[in-house]
Amino acid sequence: KDIYPHEERAFYSLACNHCEHPACVAACPVEAYTKREDGVVVHNPERCIGCKNCTRNCPYGAPRFNEETRKAEKCSMCYEDIDIGMNPACVNACPVGALSIIDLDADTVPDNVVQYPPGFPHMPQLNP
């Protein structure tokens, strides 16, 4: 068949995966990234020098370079909301309830959780 019309489509959130061993943290020469105890990887734009090392090294394309500010930016997992027991904005905004925050180290993980969906870079050393 031709490429169009698609018989099946899949949509993936390509926000930050907050990897266990994040490439962005390792690549940043000024430590603009920190990893919290809860696993959230936070970017500090005040420290960022705009070198783009994080954007080049993240296989998932999570950090993006903002041409206007000349600095990297990425999903913060809305850690301020998580700290007060709320969900991140993306979870609340998803119209079909497809997004959720899941602890992959928990004893029970829902059956429908897929860590490496088709087409997603397989990088077990980062443990997204």
Residue map of PLM features:
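Non-ligating segments of multi-cofactor redox enzymes
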Residues: K1-P128
